[in-house]
Swiss-Prot record:
Name under which the protein is recorded: S-layer protein
Keyword NADP part of the UniProt annotation: no
Superkingdom of the source species: Bacteria
Broad class of where this protein is predominantly found: secreted
């Protein structure tokens, strides 16, 4: 998803 909390993931 992304690189920042809470979207940590691909």
């Amino acid at each position: 998803x992304g690189k920042t909390f809470p979207d940590v993931x691909p």
